Every structure is written in C-alpha cells, then in structure tokens.
Amino acid sequence: MSEMYSAPVTVLGAGSYGTALAIALARNGHKTYLWGHQPEKMAVLATERMNNAFLPDIAFPDALEIESDLVQAIAKVRDILIVVPSHVFADVLTQIKPLLNAHHRIMWATKGLERNTGRLLQTVAQEILGNQYPLAVLSGPTFAKELAQGLPTAIALSSTDSQFADEMQQRIHCSKAFRVYLNNDMIGVQLGGAIKNVIAIGAGISDGMGFGANARTALITRGLAEISRLGASLGANSNTFMGMAGLGDLVLTCTDNQSRNRRFGLMLGQGKSAEEAMAEIGQVVEGFYNTKEAYLLAQTQGVEMPIVEQIYQMLFCGKNAHDVATSLLGRERKGE
C-alpha cells in the first residue's frame, strides 16, 4: 500500500456520523484519529472502544484512535474531515485555523447551510481559511448506523482540487461496502445534502397526518424540482440532483425512520410542537435550522420553493400542519 493510501486522517466530530466515518476509514486500513469537543466523553470512548451513546455495540477498529487534544489531532495529519452540525461549522474552522500548515487539506461531511445567512459551507470555509487549502465535501445517502456496521453504502465526493479528490476517493472507497463517486459540482453536492433535510420534514409531516404514499411521493418529486431550481440559480449542474447527493439522499431521508428530519416531521404531523419533537429525538435536527436558511437563500435567489416556504411558515411563523397542507394542495394549476 502506497503512502498516499496509508496517510492518517483526523475526523473532527464524535457524533453518530463522525464516528461512523471514522470507523469506516479505520476499517479500510487507515490510521484514523477521532476528536470531539468534550474531553470527558472522549475518555469514555477511548476506554470502551465504542460510542455507546450513538452507535452501541459497534467496536472501534484497531486503527481508530481517540484524540482529545485538538492541537495534536491537527498536527498528526495532513487530511482533516469535519463532521459537526452546520451551526458550529464556522466555529470549528475558526478553532483550527491557527493550527493549520500549508500542507493541510480540509474535507467535510456536514450537511447544511450557514445559520441565519443561507450561505453554502464552502463559502464559509473560504471566508475563514482563505483559498490556500484544498477543500472537499462528502455527501450522499448514508445513515450512520448502517455505515458503521459495514452495510453497503454509496456516496458522492466533490473537491476544489482534483488530486485531493482522487486520493480521498481511493482512501475511502472499499469495494466490499463503501462506494465513492467523484462529482466535480461542489455547489450541487452541498445543496442537495442541505435542502433534502427540509423536504424530509415535509414528508414526515405528510405521513404523520396520514396522507399516504401518494402524497409522500409527490412531495419527494416536487421537492427535488425545488432543489433543482435553486441549484440552477446558483450554477449547479442539474445532473448532480439525479445522483447520490441529490435524489439518493432525498429518497433515503424522506422514507426511512432512521432520519431525524423525517421523524421530526412525523411528530409535527401528529400534533407535537417543534420543541417537543426535538426533545424526544435528543439529537440535532439539521432540517429545523436548514428550513430558515433554505427559505432565505430562495428569497435571495428569487426562486419559488413552495414546499420549503410552507414548512418555514409552520416552523417559524406559527402556521399549523393542516393549513400548510391546504396551502400546498390549493396552489394554482400549472404544468409540471
């Protein structure tokens, strides 16, 4: 195995998805350091050799090492994979900026938009770090538990640097379980991963109200159209939204109850408040925050996104689920 393949990786973020990606990398034979912002919890992970809070009974591979010191976590590697909630993405970049050297390369698997602005995370990264570091994004239909268990999974990888993309594809890709597709459309890959969370809330609301499979499928289909329109306004490639980071992630998130966003929507459709639903889920529901950012971005771009708009009205303006459904179903007749 060449040095390119065996170079170590640091994963920043020890939640379910960050841990799962660290497990997948380590299982593939690469020295992997996993860092989290709470040293006492990282000490438990190091002792138990698993993340029982998020991925119980899935043992860490020998190549996975817990690192609670951020300085060391950055100093030991060239390649950094950030897997934190979108609302702290900028904070993590600000933390690591003084620790970076010219050789570092940054990738993230965070799905979302910048809080209160709707900006793509690539824009945030370039604003904080400048343009001297190769950047990449990993996105697609991946539930953390299945990935950590080694079940077959496929994902998309896009980068500003073709060499970085090629090397990370070869490092992550595992012919037995984890397939990585390269995509040169960073805008589309980021956008698909963020907006699908909002549509998944809508699908959950629909199912929670008992509207059935026909309505769910219509929401997914029209949701994809909304994502594609927004992507076109930002210069994304329309083909991206038919791939892993678009349709793939959208279908997965809208149809399986492993999705926090879908479960959140289900509870809303059943009459629970947003606060009650989030408390019951007990983890970050990215789509709750992404809804506001997606709505802001659509307004900025002048793009019509009725599903996103109605979910925004429900979450942030007090509109109830029945009125949301009535508004969507009562829209004027139009061509597809």
From Swiss-Prot:
PROSITE patterns: NAD_G3PDH. It is found in: Cytoplasm. It comes from Actinobacillus pleuropneumoniae serotype 3 (strain JL03). Pathway: Membrane lipid metabolism; glycerophospholipid metabolism. GO terms for molecular function: glycerol-3-phosphate dehydrogenase [NAD(P)+] activity; NAD binding. HAMAP family: NAD_Glyc3P_dehydrog. Sn-glycerol 3-phosphate binds at residues 111, 140, 142, 196, 249, 259-261. The keyword Lipid biosynthesis applies. This is Glycerol-3-phosphate dehydrogenase [NAD(P)+].
